[in-house]
């Protein structure tokens, strides 16, 4: 039966039932053929200032790209902009069709416009229907700049820990499915998802109008959303989106994809060709893994297809002549797991244990464990359960403080959780019990001693006394079905003087009219004899619960028959602020909410900056000469859907200036959502000074007339802190006779100032200019120096000096950007001299003149002296040069201690990535070297294989090693045998730390010892 013979009803049934294609993933759009977005369906949780993928600069399928991505991403300059059907563009990574594509943000249109805006330059070319499809140009391939979350350290979640928040408008089953997807990643990798506490960076599951989309990797500097929109709440889709969060691009964009699949461009929907661009080797790191047809990150065969039976991606046949299936959305593939484990450097030994009971043992048990082994087990059970760990055998090498071979058990989800114990030797440890639902077990061996190893069993127990002010309680095995024949009793106690608040996120317990079988019982007190609040079962979430004291008693019971998904609840300390005499400090209305309260105002009023008092609505007519304007609610976040207009009017012949003291609005340079507009004049038809959003404080603006219009608008989503601005009306003194200034007059609010050009300073009379002194001392690690009066000609009879000092252990480099000094064969007239030290008596590095840009110059130490001299005759433009620092060099040690620092910005910033620095320390003849670490903080790893400091007893790395060091805390002093030592500092491209500070000196000591590795 042909495609045309299928009725619309049959087509719809085929799509929904999944028969048409192997996997369907509509992303940044809905799967529904008649997709429309109801504003009432948007996330209704308490506003969180998150990075919203739906407001990204552009989309690449379901991947949100921001300005940082665009600045380092280029596409072919021959894409046709004129014939693209922008109205039909959407954001999907699934199957056929363009039904219901949101028209608000056409992906290709956005992509081209943004790249054009940053200067890529797009040309028209008839490459659409019936023409050659767009492809990467050779030039753009050469010009690609490396980019990939997997190779950019800031995109990797530290320690593999990803805090999360789930928006409040998701159903219980959706929440359970999100947790199942996260547990799926945890089960097979060393990535850990944990409910957010006070972490700055975390993900927020939201329901956004653009459907399903996410950024790739960690964005940092606050929360970021993962949008799970309409018809995207499927297990496989969420696992896929979490793959982007973890740091993965789509498999079919790998650089080697043409060896494995064929892109059939004539079958691609017009305007969606860019979704099939492939990345360059420097842009994505496949971590040495083979191309993975089975990856959950792979497109399906008919993604963005013109017709449901037309392939856009055709996999190559295998050795048996069979084309492998692609685009599955069921589970992680072996390749997905291998790549994730490499990306997050998971130990080769250990696993994540999620069953209610189980066992673990050292490798090779009971026949002995290998040396230099590192294993990590993560035990993760249901919140509300505790983990009981019992070691059945212990036979490890015994050492002081268990320094060599040991087992560490921690009460939590990662290596920084509280330590329950560190064990070695042959004494079996006692029973260990966690305080919550996670436990970290780490085993390390570094000796060659052969023992049996260890074996342990664990069990999850539900119930118990909980003394916390907030936390989670879930039925055993949640989000999977609870187990039969369970009885769990919890007694929750919060701080004295408070109540216990309990809210349910999910609830599904076997239904019965009187809850006679499976049920949850909640009592207002500390025991089963306390007053009954409710006995709950069925599928309806119970109402929020508030105890009358600081204690709440809960009991969950399941029988031996029907099992359901169970429940998930949050508890916290609660008080009714509105019941207090001052009603929480609210001026007009107090609204108590569980866990908090809100002040409200009568109609015609809005909350003031303190969020308690009420004042007239924002905006208005301002006739004062000066004053302050703030966003509604300042200094708290401004409310949504606000439109405030201030009309500022000053006397005639006056001008109005506005200066922002603080500025933080949603948005970037597009300013489509929340923004401030400033006009010279009374209406929006007047002269526009600018439209502003984001976090950059606008420049001071002065009106052209005696009135100014300031308009603020916010949309219904993300709110920020807003702005605080001061306006001031004054006459423009610079408009008459340049304000009496010899060079430049700058009008300021309420006054004016005179300024002088480069090479001159302001006279004591504050109006005239005189030549400046030419002596500067520079201590910054990088910057510019210029000849006097730059970029105009330098003055005659001038002598200027610069002394540049860098942090000890670093050399100064001088690179010239422009150079034009009077020419002479021996530079006898005007010239620039550079010395290798702090004075003109130091060795000279160069004497420069003429118009040829000199080669860069480098000092041997951390100081450089520069002198510029001009005579009485010819003047030229002069020079502009950049000074910077480089690590390493030859350092002379004396009996007086000297200092050496790991990087130029030590103390201000962490060391940068991809460093390889070598310092050669030479002592006085007949002496040795003493190295004393004053500060040491370098990325920690068992073998110091990532970032490390290595010391050698000689001229090169072939000499005897005195130690390789990493981690936190200074190593012991190091003594050389000879009079020369080499220090090598290496960093990779991921985690950066504070660095190190070494004090070294020359000593005469006959019995020095090598430091131990």
From Swiss-Prot:
Co-factor binding comment: Binds 1 zinc ion per subunit.
Annotated compartments: Secreted
Positions contributing to Zn(2+) binding: 240, 244, 250
Pfam families with a match to the protein in the record: Astacin, CUB, FXa_inhibition
Enzyme Commission number: 3.4.24.-
A GO CC annotation given for this chain: extracellular region
Biological processes per GO annotation: cell differentiation; proteolysis
Major localization class: secreted
Signal peptide: 1-30
Record PANTHER family: CUB DOMAIN-CONTAINING PROTEIN, OVOCHYMASE-RELATED
The protein's name: Tolloid-like protein 1
């Amino acid at each position: 039966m042909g495609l045309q013979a299928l009725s619309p009803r049959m087509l719809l049934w085929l799509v929904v039932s999944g028969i048409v294609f192997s996997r369907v993933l509509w992303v940044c759009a809905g799967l529904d053929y008649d997709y429309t977005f109801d504003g009432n369906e948007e996330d209704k949780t308490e506003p969180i200032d998150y990075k919203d993928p739906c407001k990204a600069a552009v989309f690449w399928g379901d991947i949100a790209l921001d300005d940082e991505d665009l600045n380092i991403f280029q596409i072919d300059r021959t894409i046709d902009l004129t014939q693209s059907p922008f109205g039909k563009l959407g954001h999907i990574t699934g199957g056929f069709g363009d039904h219901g594509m949101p028209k608000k943000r056409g992906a290709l249109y956005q992509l081209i416009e943004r790249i054009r805006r940053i200067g890529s330059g797009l040309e028209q070319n008839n490459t659409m229907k019936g023409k050659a499809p767009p492809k990467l140009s050779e030039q753009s391939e050469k010009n690609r700049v490396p980019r990939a979350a997997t190779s950019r350290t800031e995109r990797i979640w530290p320690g593999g820990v990803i805090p999360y928040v789930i928006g409040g408008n998701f159903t219980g089953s959706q929440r359970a499915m999100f947790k199942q997807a996260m547990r799926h990643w945890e089960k097979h990798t060393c990535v850990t998802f944990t409910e957010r506490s006070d972490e700055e960076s975390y993900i927020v599951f939201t329901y956004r109008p653009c459907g399903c989309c996410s950024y790739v990797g960690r964005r940092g500097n606050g929360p970021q959303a993962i949008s799970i929109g309409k018809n995207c709440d499927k297990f496989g889709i969420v696992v896929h989106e979490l793959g982007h969060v973890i740091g993965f691009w789509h498999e079919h964009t790998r650089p080697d994809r043409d060896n494995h699949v064929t892109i059939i461009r004539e079958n691609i929907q017009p305007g969606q060709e860019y979704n099939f661009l492939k990345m360059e080797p420097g842009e994505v790191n496949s971590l040495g893994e083979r191309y993975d047809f089975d990856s959950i990150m792979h497109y399906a065969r008919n993604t963005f297809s013109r017709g449901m039976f037309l392939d856009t991606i055709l996999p190559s046949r295998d050795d048996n002549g069979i084309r492998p299936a692609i685009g599955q959305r069921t589970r992680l593939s072996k390749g997905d797991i291998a790549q994730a484990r490499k990306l997050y450097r998971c130990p080769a030994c250990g696993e994540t244990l999620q069953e209610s009971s189980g066992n673990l043992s050292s490798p090779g048990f009971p026949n002995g464990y290998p040396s230099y082994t590192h294993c990590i087990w993560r035990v993760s059970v249901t919140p509300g359960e505790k983990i009981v760990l019992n070691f059945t055998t212990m036979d490890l090498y015994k050492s002081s403080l268990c320094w060599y071979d040991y087992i560490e058990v921690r009460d939590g989800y990662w290596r920084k959780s509280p330590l329950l114990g560190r064990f070695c030797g042959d004494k079996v440890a006692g029973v260990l019990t966690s305080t919550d639902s996670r436990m970290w077990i780490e085993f390390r061996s570094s000796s060659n001693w052969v023992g049996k190893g260890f074996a342990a069993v664990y069990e999850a127990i539900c119930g118990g006394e909980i003394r916390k002010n907030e936390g989670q309680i879930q039925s055993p095995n949640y989000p999977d079905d609870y187990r039969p024949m369970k009885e769990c009793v919890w007694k929750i106690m919060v701080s004295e003087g408070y109540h216990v608040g309990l809210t349910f996120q999910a609830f599904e317990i076997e239904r019965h009219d009187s809850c006679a079988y499976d049920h949850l019982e909640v009592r207002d007190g500390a025991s089963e004899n306390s007053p009954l609040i409710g006995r709950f079962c069925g599928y309806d979430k119970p109402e929020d619960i508030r105890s009358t004291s600081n204690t709440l008693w809960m009991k969950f019971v399941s029988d031996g028959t029907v099992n359901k998904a169970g429940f998930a609840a949050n508890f916290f300390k609660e008080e009714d602020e509105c019941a207090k005499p001052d009603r929480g400090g609210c001026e007009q209305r107090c609204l108590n909410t569980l866990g908090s309260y809100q002040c409200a105002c009568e109609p015609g009023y809005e909350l003031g900056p303190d969020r308690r008092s009420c004042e007239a609505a924002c905006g208005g007519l301002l006739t004062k000469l000066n004053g302050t304007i703030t966003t509604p609610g300042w200094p708290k976040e401004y409310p949504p859907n606000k439109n405030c207009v201030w009309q500022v009017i000053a006397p005639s012949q006056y001008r109005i200036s506005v200066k922002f003291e603080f500025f933080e609005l949603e948005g970037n340079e597009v300013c489509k959502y929340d923004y401030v507009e400033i006009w010279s004049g009374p209406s929006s038809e007047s002269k526009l000074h600018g439209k502003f959003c984001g976090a950059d404080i606008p420049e001071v603006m002065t009106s052209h007339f005696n009135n100014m219009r300031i308009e603020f608008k916010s949309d219904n989503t993300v709110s920020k802190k807003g702005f605080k601005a001061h306006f001031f009306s004054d006459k423009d003194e610079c408009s008459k006779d340049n304000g009496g200034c010899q060079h430049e007059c700058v009008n300021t609010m309420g006054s004016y100032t005179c300024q002088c050009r480069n090479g001159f300073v302001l006279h004591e009379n504050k109006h005239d200019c005189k030549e400046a002194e030419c002596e500067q001392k520079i201590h910054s690690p990088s910057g510019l120096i210029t000849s006097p009066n730059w970029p105009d000609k330098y003055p005659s009879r001038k002598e200027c000096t610069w002394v540049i000092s860098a942090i000890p252990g670093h050399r100064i480099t001088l690179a010239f950007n422009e150079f034009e000094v009077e020419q002479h064969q021996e530079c006898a007239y005007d010239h620039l001299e550079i010395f290798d030290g702090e004075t003109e008596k130091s060795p000279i590095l160069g004497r420069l003149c003429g118009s040829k840009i000199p080669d860069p110059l480098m000092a041997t130490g951390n100081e450089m002296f520069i002198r510029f001299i001009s005579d009485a005759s010819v003047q030229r433009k002069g020079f502009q040069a950049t000074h910077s620092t480089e690590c390493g060099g030859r350092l002379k040690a004396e009996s007086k201690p000297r200092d050496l620092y790991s990087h130029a910005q030590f103390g201000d910033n962490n060391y940068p990535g991809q460093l390889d620095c070598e310092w050669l320390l030479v002592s006085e003849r007949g002496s040795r070297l003493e190295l004393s670490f004053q500060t040491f903080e370098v990325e920690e790893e068992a073998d110091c294989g990532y970032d490390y400091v290595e010391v050698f007893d000689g001229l090169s790395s072939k000499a005897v090693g005195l130690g390789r060091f990493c981690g936190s805390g200074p190593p012991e002093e190091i003594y050389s045998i000879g009079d020369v030592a080499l220090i090598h500092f290496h960093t990779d491209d991921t985690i950066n730390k504070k660095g190190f500070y070494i004090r070294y000196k020359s000593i005469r000591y006959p019995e020095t010892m090598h430091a131990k590795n």
